[in-house]
């Protein structure tokens, strides 16, 4: 008996749409990362991208527990000396709500070329509209 290995050209990828309204950020991100990797499929292979495409709507309405709305801080560096910048969860939601979900999911994916390919299949939108109707995404309840 041989071990099954998925081939990149034979992987069937579906499109799913998820509504993030009222969902807890971390719990949503873990399920998104799992589906982007393809771990929910029987033909999952660690070194092959077997995941699905996922569209996340209403990213501006994602929830966090406790005091994280004001206490959770995101850091990034501009590349210049003394260029460390910070923003709270509240500021991030006000400025770029998509980035909050993207950062959470990206940290849960593998680092390297395979992880970047998986991350490209995540489409996040702040509002209720998306431009992927041609792909006929199925509603995914998380």
From Swiss-Prot:
One GO term (biological process): cytoplasmic translation
GO cellular component terms given for this protein: cytoplasm; cytosol; cytosolic large ribosomal subunit; ribosome
Keywords annotated in UniProt: Ribonucleoprotein, Ribosomal protein
Cystine pairings recorded for this chain: none
MF annotations from Gene Ontology: large ribosomal subunit rRNA binding; mRNA 5'-UTR binding; mRNA binding; structural constituent of ribosome; zinc ion binding
KW Ribosomal protein (keyword) present: yes
Ribosomal protein in keyword set: yes
Pfam families given in the database record: Ribosomal_L13 (PF00572)
HAMAP family linked: Ribosomal_uL13
Oligomeric and partner information: Part of the 50S ribosomal subunit.
PANTHER family in UniProt: LARGE RIBOSOMAL SUBUNIT PROTEIN UL13M, RIBOSOMAL PROTEIN L13
Similarity comment: Belongs to the universal ribosomal protein uL13 family.
Cited function: This protein is one of the early assembly proteins of the 50S ribosomal subunit, although it is not seen to bind rRNA by itself. It is important during the early stages of 50S assembly.
Protein known as: Large ribosomal subunit protein uL13
Designated gene of the protein: rplM
